[in-house]
């Protein structure tokens, strides 16, 4: 409403300025000149021949232009001959000069209503009602700013252009000083009603009462001047009002557009709120699912791991999961701080926030379908420990931390649809590993039985073959078992992708290390039994060697020497390395075969060896007791 209240006085101000401006100023003058030149070019062939018989070849002026202008002005048609044209040209030439900005200020003011009749009387004192009618029309247009019809305005424009062309055609006619003196007051009296007191006496003094020739040009010139002023003012006012109506329409359109924009902004803000709330709800749901999954995984991992080496890595991963949750919690807060006008940005942010967990869920579903074996490893280990299998007796190796910690970070997202499939896979995996554990037990019992049998045979028949069996029975058999176990694992578990291959490799390494630990325990036990038996044998041999030196041969001596070498080899062994143990045993066997028989036949040398063997056996027994 405020804009409309301001536009109405602005329209009147612009209309007043347009009326007061010079008629031939700016682009309008250029357009009038172009139109006039075009009409001259088109009508020059017809009018140039002097149709009225004038000697100069100029139109006489009694054309339809002047008659139509008089008819539009409301006056009677004056069919006076040639005397109407010469003042016509002078009046058209004088009119732009006299219509300056000083006189325009007077015309745009508030003229008295009595001035217009005075001007009509001063013009009608020479003869006519045409001047009075024209002056009244001009006074009405100046006072009331009446808006004429568009059709009438177009007709007046045509009339004014025709009059201007005729004026240009008659511009070459000489002007008399009398006509100039009589026209300038008339034109002034027609334009500025306020100057009637000064103009009317001058016009009366210059008139000759008896001459009709001066009256008719004067009256005609005033009629034409008034019609020109009326047509021009009507054109200007019609143009101004057209512009005003167009500006009103534009303002209405802009108001409607602003209202529509405000409505769309409101709708966008509501949509932004809805999307942000949906994004928050979805993010909170995903966070709760992630927290539940991470808690369940963390509990399973804590039950599986007995060492302190695994806990820092799990704590770090749990911290990383918590940091992810906090960053996802911060995203909606940042979106809330954004301006509501930026609807596209808020929508894009909310879409990205919603799309991220969906993509991760899809990726996790693919990973679970392709590599379901990875997720069931730690749970199978936990079930084996609960059922009391020999896996619980094994010592945890350095690969346990990697194996147990690896699936925790990968399987934060679990889709509820795959839970049944995972349970079936877990049960199948448990059955497979139980079968493997039973096979390992049977193999280990067979190994222990074979080792005991070999020890008994070595005691009953002490020869080189039995010594080789004692020295080598522990080493190659676990290698064969490992190869068989590896083939079984390779047959049972075919890797589907790189993750499955790595998990299988970790399982194999773990099984190998568990077997090595079991083998070391069995070998330590066997060595202790051997040490006790060797002590008895050494004492018995020492007592028998004094009485029966001749009965001893190379093989019992080699047996005692191998005992010394084996005990020395055991002193150099470390319980964490199997290769050094095997190499020590092999070296003892080689050294036993390389001892010359003549050295062992000497009694002094044999006594020294038996004493050294007894001392070494005592040292080895104390060392093994300390280690156990």
Curated annotation (Swiss-Prot):
Its main location: secreted. This is Otolith matrix protein OMM-64. The keyword Glycoprotein applies. It comes from Oncorhynchus mykiss. Residues 182-214 have a biased composition (Polar residues). Keywords: Extracellular matrix, Glycoprotein, Secreted, Signal. One of its GO terms (cellular component) is extracellular region. Residues 78-93, 613-628 have a biased composition (Low complexity). Calcium-binding component of otoliths, a calcium carbonate structure of the inner ear involved in hearing and balance sensing. Binds calcium. Residues 1-20 form the signal peptide. The Asp/Glu-rich (acidic) region mediates binding to calcium. Specifically expressed in otolith matrix-producing cells. Glycans are attached at residue 318. It is found in: Secreted, Extracellular space, Extracellular matrix. Residues 43-628 are annotated as: Disordered. Residues 449-462, 477-489, 514-536, 544-556, 565-578 have a biased composition (Acidic residues). It comes from the Eukaryota. The lineage of its organism: Eukaryota, Metazoa, Chordata, Craniata, Vertebrata. Residues 246-266, 276-285, 311-343 have a biased composition (Basic and acidic residues).
């Amino acid at each position: 409403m405020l804009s409309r209240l301001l536009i109405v006085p602005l329209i009147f101000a612009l209309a007043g300025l347009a009326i007061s401006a010079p008629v031939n100023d700016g682009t309008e003058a250029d357009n009038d000149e172009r139109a006039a030149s075009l009409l001259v070019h088109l009508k020059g062939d017809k009018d140039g021949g002097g149709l009225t018989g004038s000697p100069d070849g100029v139109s006489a002026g009694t054309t339809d232009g002047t008659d139509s202008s008089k008819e539009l002005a409301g006056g009677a048609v004056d069919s006076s001959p040639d005397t109407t044209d010469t003042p016509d040209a002078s009046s058209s030439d004088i009119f732009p000069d006299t219509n300056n900005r000083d006189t325009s200020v007077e015309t745009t003011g508030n003229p008295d209503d009595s001035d217009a009749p005075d001007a009509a009387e001063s013009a009608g004192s020479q003869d006519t009602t045409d001047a009075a009618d024209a002056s009244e029309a001009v006074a009405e247009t100046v006072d009331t700013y009446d808006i004429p019809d568009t059709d009438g305005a177009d007709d007046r424009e045509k009339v004014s252009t025709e009059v201007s062309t005729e004026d240009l055609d008659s511009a070459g006619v000489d002007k008399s000083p009398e006509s100039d003196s009589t026209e300038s007051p008339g034109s002034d009296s027609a334009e500025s009603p306020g100057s009637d007191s000064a103009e009317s006496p001058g016009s009366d003094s210059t008139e000759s009462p008896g001459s009709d020739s001066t009256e008719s040009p004067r009256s005609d010139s005033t009629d034409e001047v008034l019609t020109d002023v009326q047509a021009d003012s009507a054109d200007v006012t019609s143009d101004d009002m057209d512009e005003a109506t167009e500006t009103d329409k534009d303002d209405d359109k802009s108001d409607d557009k602003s209202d529509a924009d405000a409505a769309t902004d409101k709708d966008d803000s509501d949509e932004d709120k809805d999307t942000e709330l949906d994004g928050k709800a979805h993010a909170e749901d995903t966070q709760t699912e992630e927290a539940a999954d991470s808690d369940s995984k963390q509990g399973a991992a804590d039950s599986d791991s007995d060492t302190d080496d695994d806990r820092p890595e799990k704590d770090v991963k749990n911290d990383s999961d918590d940091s992810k949750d906090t960053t996802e919690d911060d995203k909606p807060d940042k979106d809330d701080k954004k301006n509501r006008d930026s609807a596209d940005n808020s929508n894009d942010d909310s879409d990205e926030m919603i799309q991220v967990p969906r993509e991760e869920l899809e990726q996790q579903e693919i990973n679970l379908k392709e590599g379901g074996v990875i997720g069931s490893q730690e749970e199978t280990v936990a079930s084996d420990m609960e059922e009391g299998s020999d896996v619980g007796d094994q010592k945890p190796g350095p690969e346990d931390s990697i194996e147990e910690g690896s699936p925790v970070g990968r399987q934060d997202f679990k889709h509820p649809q795959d839970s049944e499939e995972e349970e079936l896979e877990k049960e199948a995996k448990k059955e497979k590993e139980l079968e493997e554990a039973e096979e390992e037990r049977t193999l280990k019992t067979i190994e222990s039985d074979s080792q005991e049998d070999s020890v008994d045979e070595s005691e009953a028949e002490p020869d080189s073959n039995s010594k080789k069996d004692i020295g080598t029975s522990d080493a190659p058999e676990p290698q064969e078992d490992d190869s068989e176990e590896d083939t079984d694992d390779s047959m049972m578990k075919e890797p589907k992708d790189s993750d499955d291959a790595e998990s299988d490799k970790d399982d194999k390494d773990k099984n190998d290390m568990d077997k090595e630990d079991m083998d070391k325990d069995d070998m330590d036990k066997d060595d202790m039994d051997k040490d006790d038996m060797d002590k008895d044998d050494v004492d018995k041999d020492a007592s028998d060697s004094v009485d029966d030196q001749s009965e001893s041969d190379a093989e019992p001596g080699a047996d005692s020497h191998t005992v010394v070498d084996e005990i020395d080899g055991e002193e150099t062994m470390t319980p964490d390395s199997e290769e050094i143990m095997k190499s020590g045993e092999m070296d003892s066997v080689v050294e036993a075969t390389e001892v010359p028989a003549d050295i062992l036949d000497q009694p002094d040398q044999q006594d020294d060896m038996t004493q050294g063997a007894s001392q070494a056996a005592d040292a080895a027994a104390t060392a093994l007791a300390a280690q156990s």
